[in-house]
Amino acid sequence: MKKHLLPLALLFSGISPAQALDVGDISSFMNSDSSTLSKTIQNSTDSGRLINIRLERLSSPLDDGQVIAMDKPDELLLTPASLLLPAQASEVIRFFYKGPADEKERYYRIVWFDQALSDAQRDNANRSAVATASARIGTILVVAPRQANYHFQYANGSLTNTGNATLRILAYGPCLKAANGKECKENYYLMPGKSRRFTRVDTADNKGRVALWQGDKFIPVK
């Protein structure tokens, strides 16, 4: 799923994934009726970390997405953009959308620069914190259109998003292939204009179920 929809870019230098900052979900969504979003980050290591956060607007959250200019300088704001996070501590990062209230879905990459700190130059007069290991983590923020139009088409186990906002789609029930067991489940993010066929769940079976979320609203499809 991550290959096709809202991938995570995670580039490490000097530390392993287990030691990296925990930034929560790979993909975050700001629904059309909200202009703010909070994201909790956590430092589960035994050393303090210096965190710097940068925002980039993307043409698409898929692998071929390019960094593009924002419509206005204050289109998307966050606070705090830089912080020292003590060992075993957490912090809430808040995002504020102030861009156009139109029918366009917008995609942003949140770039987290994470540096572990150690004490150096210890003496009676001073102490200074020096970065000893670093990581660059990328997550995706999807801002739904302020004027969202949710529409879809379903036929023969395939869903098409004919609206202008990303849907979260779900299928569950008997497995299509016996090798996969008795019960299977699939869930994906489906961008506007995209189609997705369920390949693990037997949606033609009477017990096969298909559903989706339009923002926070759950919609049974089959």
Swiss-Prot record:
InterPro entries: EcpB_C (IPR040695), Ig-like_fold (IPR013783), PapD-like_sf (IPR008962). Pfam families: EcpB_C. Induction: Negatively regulated by H-NS. Positively regulated by IHF and EcpR. Residues 1-20 form the signal peptide. The keyword Signal applies. It comes from the Bacteria. Part of the ecpRABCDE operon, which encodes the E.coli common pilus (ECP). ECP is found in both commensal and pathogenic strains and plays a dual role in early-stage biofilm development and host cell recognition. This is Probable fimbrial chaperone EcpB.
